[in-house]
């Protein structure tokens, strides 16, 4: 989880730098909307922050004891990576003044579906961990 959070931090910061330099290099008007400008925030929020929160939950509730946690990790991260990649590609096309295709939107939609499925798996694992944790606390107070 730490490596995933650190990787998202590095790629999030790099994507912000890429956005600034790529738009400047190509004479793209400042303040004009492009998806390229949002990749930075998506990677930092959906990547770094979520992984840090999950890391804290893992430490306190042992989420990885549930087999769905592994499914969450890989599904969610595949979704974030796919979404960020499609946003980057779409943003590059916008800056270069080239049209985007429906395929890019479709693949980005698939990325969003994977993120959603990942969140569902996380909440299923979290619910199981909360019940396990609650049962242990109840057993401790009755003993």
Q: Would you name each region that the model predicts?
A:
Residues 1-143:
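Hydrophobic alpha-helical transmembrane segments of multi-pass integral membrane proteins
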């Amino acid at each position: 989880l730490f490596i995933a959070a650190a990787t998202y931090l590095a790629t999030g910061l790099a994507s912000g730098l890429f956005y600034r330099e790529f738009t400047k290099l190509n004479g793209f008007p400042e303040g004009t909307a492009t998806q390229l400008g949002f990749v930075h925030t998506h990677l930092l929020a959906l990547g770094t922050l979520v992984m840090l929160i999950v890391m804290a939950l893992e430490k306190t509730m042992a989420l990885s004891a549930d087999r769905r946690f592994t499914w969450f990790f890989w599904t969610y991260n595949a979704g974030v990576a796919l979404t960020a990649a499609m946003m980057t590609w779409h943003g590059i096309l916008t800056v270069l003044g080239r049209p985007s295709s429906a395929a890019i939107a479709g693949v980005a939609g698939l990325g969003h579906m994977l993120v959603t499925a990942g969140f569902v798996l996380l909440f299923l694992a979290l619910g199981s961990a909360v019940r396990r944790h609650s049962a242990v606390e109840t057993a401790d107070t009755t003993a």
